[in-house]
């Protein structure tokens, strides 16, 4: 019980600091904001740790980096996020973009090489800070319907603690 109280106290104290780090973030899509899923929903087989942006039942909308950082990981899987991009930001937070229909051409080439090298469709590739830097607004892929998705949308998460702690950034206003 003491551990739970300590964790809650830490989160309460740090919330204003975490909120400040996303004051200047932009929307990842050039569409009116409309959510089909929110943080904290209990799904039949998991806790929903992000938000789902509607894309009007269509795929292929440009997905933008919400802040400066670097692409630290991409993943491809027939389940979960499907095609996913992970951006590490310079303040220690991470944004995750899931169910993409495609990556940028440079990332797509790396993914294809890795798939052939591993003789596997599913891959997870980590990158160093200097390989794929991104600026706020850069296109990192296209919205889609890959992985465990019930329809076209963009799944996005914000994680703290070096990418290990999903957080409800919508609660910050």
Per-region residue spans from a language model:
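A solvent-exposed, charged loop/short amphipathic helix patch at secondary-structure junctions
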Residues: 111-122
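Sec-dependent signal peptide recognition
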Residues: 2-10
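N-terminal signal peptide c-region/cleavage motif recognized by signal peptidases
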Residues: 14-16
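Conserved beta3 VAIK motif of the Hanks protein kinase fold
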Residues: 97
